[in-house]
Amino acid sequence: MVRKITELEKVLIQKSKPPDRTSHFLNKAVKLGLENKYAESIVCLDRVIRINPKLAIAWYYKGTALNVLGQYQEAIICLENVHRNWCEAWNQKGIAYANLKKYFEAITCFEKAIKFDTDNQSAYAENKARVIKELEENNV
């Protein structure tokens, strides 16, 4: 359920033109994430966030890395700092809630991901379907 960075996101990082230090640590964090070095990536992302706490992509990557590391509550907190119409952030938030067994919150997040991204609705719908199935199996 965790995905790799897309080419579009790479372009968005480059186009956002943050200050040099921010760009350096953000690029390093992305590289470390692609190497599955999530804890090290988070250290870099924390530096980016200290420099520019409004840089949504840093919060998104940190939330995604925390999800991979199983730190779901912390992931949700990070993902709260991402733009409300960023579908992949809603998807990551849904994954975190699902792993915390907060199924109704997860479903809501997946529905928002579907709403904001008409191109990838099937991936988010699959995540939503998994949560609904788990709800049914656990008689919640």
Segments from the language model and where they lie:
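Start-of-helix register in tetratricopeptide repeats
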Residues: S23, I57, E88, S122-A123, ...
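Canonical tetratricopeptide repeat
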Residues: N27, Y61, V68, Q92, ...
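Register position in tetratricopeptide repeats
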Residues: L34, V68, N99, R130-E134
